[in-house]
Amino acid sequence: MKFKADEISSIIKERIEKFDFNLEIEETGKIISVADGVAKVYGLKNAMAGEMVEFENGEKGMVLNLEESSVGIVILGKGLGLKEGSSVKRLKKLLKVPVGDALIGRVVNALGEPIDAKGVIEASEYRFVEEKAKGIMARKSVHEPLHTGIKAIDALVPIGRGQRELIIGDRQTGKTTVAIDTIISQKGKDVICIYVAIGQKQSTVAQVVKKLEEYGAMDYTIVVNAGASDPAALQYLAPYAGVTMGEYFRDNSRHALIVYDDLSKHAVAYREMSLILRRPPGREAYPGDVFYLHSRLLERASKLSDELGAGSLTALPIIETQAGDVSAYIPTNVISITDGQIFLETDLFNSGIRPAINVGLSVSRVGGAAQIKATKQVSGTLRLDLAQYRELQAFAQFASDLDEASRKQLERGQRMVEVLKQPPYSPLSPENQVVIIFAGTKGYLDDVAVSKIGEFEAALYPFIEAKYPEIFEQIRTKKALDKDLEEKLAKALSEFKANHI
C-alpha cells in the first residue's frame, strides 16, 4: 500500500495531535532513619505541615516536623518493612475520614476504616480531620437539655446540648459507666453518639461494644477505636476523627454526643510522638502545645445558631487523675477548657455511693439554662441540703447529742444520698427523676427506712404509671410543676405510702 507524500504528512500530523503527553511529576524523598513510629525523611523540600505522604510499602504517614534538611513524619500504621533508604512520596493532600450515616453501628479505627468485620463502609462524604472550630456568630448559647438518665447529674450538674462537660476521677471510679449510661439514655431521642476509645485495652472496648449492643444503643452509635497496641499516631488522631464524624451530623441540623475515653492517654500519646520528634519538653515532659492539642479539639463541640440549622455536638471528655490530684497539668488544662466537670471519688465509690459523684466539686457552668423547669423546681435546694448534710455528718461523728432539727436534717440527708444512688446501665426518664426527688425533698421518705428506699423507688414508678398516668404525662408535656400537679403528686405519694409501707 502506497501513500502519497501529503497523506503521510497528514497522518503524522494527526498522530501528533492525538498523542497524550500526560506527565505526572512526583516529589519523593528518602528515609534517613525510622524508629518508634516516626520516620526522618530527606528530600521532601516542599512538604507542608499536616500533609499526607505514602511509603514504599503502601502505608500512609503525616508530616509533623519541618526541619532545615529533613522532615519528621509519623507513620499511620505498624511501619513494618520500612528501612533507611526507602522512598517516600508526597500526596499533596491533608488527611480526610469518611462521615455520614453509613458509619452508624460500626466500629472503625482512627482513619475511619472498619475493624468490626462487617464489610466495607460506603461513605457518601469525606471530611478533613483538622477543621477550624465555629466562630462566635455561628453559635447559640446552650439552652436544650441533654438528659443523661442519671439522677445526680440531671438534678445537680445538668448538661445541655452543645456543652463540654468533663468527667474526671481516679481509675475504677465509674467514669466510663457514666458515659455509657448517657449514650444508652439517648435511645429514641434522635441523638447520634460517638464513643472514642483512646489507648484502651481491646478487651475493654469489646466489653463496651457488647454493652451498647445489649441495650440497643449501637443502632445510633459509632465507635472509634485506637487501642493500646495501636501506634501513638493513631491514638493522637482518633479524637479528631471522631469529632469530624460528629460535626457532619451537627452541620446537618442533627444532634450528636461524643465521648473521649480518655484524654489523659491522648496527651500521653502526643507526648510520646513529640519526644521522638525531639520537640522540647515542658512541664511533666509534655510539649508546650499540649493545651492547644485539647482546646482545638473541645472547641469543635458547639450548639449552632438557627441560621446554620440549630444542630449540636455535645462533648464528654474523660480524664483519669492520679490519687485524686486535680491540680496536675492535664486535668487543670481540660478543666479550664470545658464548661464544667463531674468529679468522681474513690472513697464514695468504695462506700457504695454509685455513681460516685462528689456534689461539692462537680459543677455545670452553662447547663443550668438547659435544665427543665420541673427538675429545677424539685432539686433547687438539693445541693445546699447535701452540703449541709456532709457538714453535719462530719460533726455527728464527734458529738452524740444532736438537737432535733439537726437530727432530722441528718436523716433526710441520708435518704437523699440513697435516692441519688443508681445501678449502672439503668437510666431514668426526666419524669421519673422529678417524682422521686420530689418525694425526697418534700419529706415523703423521712419515715421510710434507708435500706428500703431502693425498693420504695422501684415500686413507685409502676404504681404512678398504673394509677396516675397523667402525672408523668403532664411532666413530659408541661416540663414544669404547677400547684395542681404538685397536689396530685402529693396525693399519689400519700396513697402509695399507705398501701406499701
From Swiss-Prot:
It catalyses: ATP + H2O + 4 H(+)(in) = ADP + phosphate + 5 H(+)(out). Its main location: membrane. GO terms for molecular function: ADP binding; ATP binding; proton-transporting ATP synthase activity, rotational mechanism. GO terms for cellular component: plasma membrane; proton-transporting ATP synthase complex. SUPFAM superfamilies: C-terminal domain of alpha and beta subunits of F1 ATP synthase, N-terminal domain of alpha and beta subunits of F1 ATP synthase, P-loop containing nucleoside triphosphate hydrolases. ATP binds at G169, D170, R171, Q172, T173, G174, K175, T176. It is a peripheral membrane protein. The keyword Chaperone does not apply. InterPro entries: ATP_synth_asu-like_sf (IPR023366), ATP_synth_asu_C (IPR000793), ATP_synth_asu_C_sf (IPR038376), ATP_synth_F1_a_nt-bd_dom (IPR033732), ATP_synth_F1_asu (IPR005294), ATPase_a/bsu_AS (IPR020003), ATPase_F1/V1/A1_a/bsu_N (IPR004100), ATPase_F1/V1/A1_a/bsu_N_sf (IPR036121). It is found in: Cell inner membrane. Its EC number is 7.1.2.2. Keywords: ATP synthesis, ATP-binding, Cell inner membrane, Cell membrane, CF(1), Hydrogen ion transport, Ion transport, Membrane, Nucleotide-binding, Translocase, Transport. The record marks S362 as: Required for activity. Signal peptide: none annotated. Belongs to the ATPase alpha/beta chains family. Produces ATP from ADP in the presence of a proton gradient across the membrane. The alpha chain is a regulatory subunit. F-type ATPases have 2 components, CF(1) - the catalytic core - and CF(0) - the membrane proton channel. CF(1) has five subunits: alpha(3), beta(3), gamma(1), delta(1), epsilon(1). CF(0) has three main subunits: a(1), b(2) and c(9-12). The alpha and beta chains form an alternating ring which encloses part of the gamma chain. CF(1) is attached to CF(0) by a central stalk formed by the gamma and epsilon chains, while a peripheral stalk is formed by the delta and b chains. This is ATP synthase subunit alpha. The gene is atpA.
